[in-house]
Design a protein with these regions (language model features):
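Metalloprotease/metallohydrolase-associated module, dominated by Zn2+-dependent proteases
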Residues: 2-81, 97-141
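Active-site recognition of the HExxH zinc-binding catalytic motif
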Residues: 84-97
Length: 141
């Protein structure tokens, strides 16, 4: 998901938290648990640079028609729960086609980044957070 207010720097070294290999192993475990074995998933460690200073934990790039996706994880996690971020991004991937279809319908009537569009995006994010907590069996976020 590209965004005009940020830059993504690829091919960076992991600064702290789980190693890139540890994240990949965790991704494979969750890929099986989430029944995403038909997806070709990869993981990249990146640095997110945002104009507003927001510290982003993760993101993804997906081609749902090919069932391919790359999960982007920050090189310098600060929340201490990379598993949560990883599963959160995987849930986004599962919802991505549905999300894009609904967003396209919304954008026929509303401007991108309008209050209505932002409400849609906020609601989507809350849904993904809620599903992530349920799947992980957590109530701490």
């Amino acid at each position: 998901m590209e965004n005009e207010d940020r830059e993504i720097i690829y091919d960076v070294e992991k600064e702290n938290g789980l190693s890139a290999g540890g994240l990949e192993e965790l991704m494979k475990q969750w890929q099986a648990k989430l029944q995403m074995d038909d997806w070709n998933l990869s993981l990249k460690v990146v640095e997110f640079k945002r104009k507003n200073g927001y510290r982003q934990s993760g993101d993804f790039v997906a081609i749902p028609e090919n069932k391919q996706a790359t999960i982007l994880m920050t090189s310098n996690p600060w929340r201490g729960d990379e598993e949560y971020t990883l599963v959160h991004e995987m849930i986004h991937i599962l919802f991505y086609e549905y999300d894009k279809s609904n967003e396209a319908l919304l954008l026929k009537n509303f401007e991108k980044f309008s209050a209505d569009h932002e409400k849609y995006m906020d609601t989507l994010e809350e849904l993904v957070h809620h599903m992530t907590r349920i799947i992980l069996g957590r109530s701490d976020r």
